[in-house]
Amino acid sequence: MFSFLKRLILLAILIVLAAAGGVVWWAQQPVSLSASPLEVVIKPNSSVSSVGKQLANAGVGVQPQLFSVLARATGNAKSLKAGGYALETGATPMSILDKMARGEVTHYVVTVIEGWSMRQMRAVVDAEPALKHDTAGMSDADLMRKIGAPETNPEGLFFPDTYLFARGSSDVELYRHAYQTMQKRLNDAWAKRSLDLPYKTPYEALTMASIIEKETGQKLERSMIAAVFVNRLRKNMLLQTDPTVIYGLGASFDGNLRKRDLQTDTPYNTYTRTGLPPTPIALPGMASLQAALNPAPSDALYFVSRGDGSSQFSTNLTDHNRAVNKYQRGQP
């Protein structure tokens, strides 16, 4: 029995050594690249498993799971830096890992998240040490003039995405690029919009998209949420959407939306004023732009959260009140 256990342990050790040897061999083999040089962008706050997937998706012939094993085995799993990397023919998994651990980026990245406010975007850009901060201390209106935009209020006008830049680049160029990207995406979506929508301009559609962005709990519900608000606009009903009220409260909002807040009139209070608010309330992504301009075919006028991130939609107030009692108050 003891002899059998010794053989079993020896076999297990041999298997581990063989696997380790296989990883070491693989780590030194050149990988295939879809182009050379190949620019690969690793997003900020990526896990080691996500880095392997981003490499593979970018056209690097690595096995994501093996790359993760290699990173952990070499103690580099938590040392990989975000940014743009230039990979050339002959690169191996080990050389790529070393490059990322040392942060040998050709470009740096700033990621702007869907649903952020302009204030949040400016805070992240201002905190990026690799940028030249030419807009620091500027008012929003001055920033818009600096990038050559005709608008004075920047809210919603910058496309949320991951942007590459070289060290020492001016933040003016980043803002200009994000602004131009939003203009292009918005105009492209406007050109493909559904018929008979209650928007007079692309800017109104952008405002609606920002509301959809803030109201959406599950991605698949965007077009239904858009349908509710579009239907209410058509009927001249109050939109009654909490995110606009919160935006209108500004710095005075403490995280708890009260009844008196819903009754306090501001230009953004859609419980007291009909129509859309005067500006967007956030930076909407492409999916929200498309939903605003191509809402689902539905007669729904109401929705309420089910408490799990999804929503219950209703076409009349009676059904809506029943849904509110069920999902918000726990009543049958």
Where do the model's predicted regions map?
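N-terminal type II signal-anchor transmembrane helix
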Residues: 1-37
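Short low-complexity stretches enriched in small and charged residues
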Residues: 6-10, 37, 77-79, 116-120, ...
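Signal peptide-directed extracytoplasmic domains
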Residues: 23-186
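Bacterial extracytoplasmic/cell-wall-associated proteins, especially those involved in peptidoglycan
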Residues: 123, 127-135, 145-332
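Intrinsically disordered, low-complexity sequence elements enriched in Ser/Thr/Gly/Pro
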Residues: 4-5, 51, 304
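Residue-level detector of flexible, active-site-proximal loop/helix-junction positions
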Residues: 15, 91, 275
